[in-house]
Amino acid sequence: MTNIVVSYILNPLIYMVPVLLAVAFLTLIERKVLGYMQLRKGPNIVGPYGLLQPIADGVKLFIKEPIRPSTSSPSLFVLPVLALTLALTLWAPMPMPFPVADLNLSILFVLALSSLAVYSILGSGWASNSKYALVGALRAVAQTISYEVSLGLILLSVIIFSGGFTLQTFSTTQEATWLALPAWPLAAMWYISTLEETNRAPFDLTEGESELVSGFNVEYAGGPFALFFLAEYANILLMNTLSAVLFLGSSYSTTMPEFTSLTLMTKAALLSMVFLWVRASYPRFRYDQLMHLVWKNFLPLTLALVIWHLSLSTACAGLPPHA
């Protein structure tokens, strides 16, 4: 009985609570960073240096009454819960250094669940019965499906490097050097694709304020809106943690496993800061530019690199490092 409680209740809670706390403070960091980049202060009233601002925002949103438009679909309108559930489930196979769910095909698990997140966006846009929400949802589906093709091919290339589908093997592969150095074109395309996958600027066409009011979540208020918000930021942290594992090596130490967690989270935090920097620096892409980037640039490049990495091992009679 104790094992069941630890495995199925305590372990998931132990990783969910820090993720939700990190999400809360990522929103604060984003507002502060954007503030200083625009030569203003950002939140600095609630608590010392504005540190209690995310708590105040959370309390304010969750005590508001969740309003549902009379013309909306009541069953599909609860999809923000699915968005957050998927965002938190994705953290299960992350090697920090020991995963909550030790899966043999953890990369495929992450790819499959990140694809499912589109359904929560599409369903909420459809359920709102608003043309702005529907257009935002359709944009999200089109761009996510487009970029997942290149994401899958980039993952295939790094799997060829490491010789395994488990995320722990990447620590072994990168003991000598980070994969971001020999495979820097892959790392650059992966990072840009994760920006798009999380609907961040300059690819935030799903919630283009100047065109679609607020995008797919325009009819949501209070708690359900906060759940979408939490899911978006949990996905940002997850994608950056995954980028750190795949390309920046999580430097596993058998004597000090907590050192692995510390270095991994530091790398993920730095990559998240670059997300904020990009948001402050670049204007939004036009929709046709977004599609041209993936279908005319990323797809041919990633296909060429997959063929190149496959042919290299055959030509040099080499095998993945630990095979």
From Swiss-Prot:
GO terms for biological process: aerobic respiration. InterPro entries: NADH_UbQ_OxRdtase_su1/FPO, NADH_UbQ_OxRdtase_su1_CS. Pfam families: NADHdh (PF00146). It is found in: Mitochondrion inner membrane. It is a multi-pass membrane protein. The chain crosses the membrane at residues 9-29, 76-96, 107-127, 145-165, 175-195, 227-247, 258-278, 298-318. Coiled coil: none annotated. Keywords: Electron transport, Membrane, Mitochondrion, Mitochondrion inner membrane, NAD, Respiratory chain, Translocase, Transmembrane, Transmembrane helix, Transport, Ubiquinone. One of its GO terms (molecular function) is NADH dehydrogenase (ubiquinone) activity. Its EC number is 7.1.1.2. It comes from the Eukaryota. It catalyses: a ubiquinone + NADH + 5 H(+)(in) = a ubiquinol + NAD(+) + 4 H(+)(out). GO terms for cellular component: mitochondrial inner membrane. Belongs to the complex I subunit 1 family. Core subunit of the mitochondrial membrane respiratory chain NADH dehydrogenase (Complex I) that is believed to belong to the minimal assembly required for catalysis. Complex I functions in the transfer of electrons from NADH to the respiratory chain. The immediate electron acceptor for the enzyme is believed to be ubiquinone. This is NADH-ubiquinone oxidoreductase chain 1.
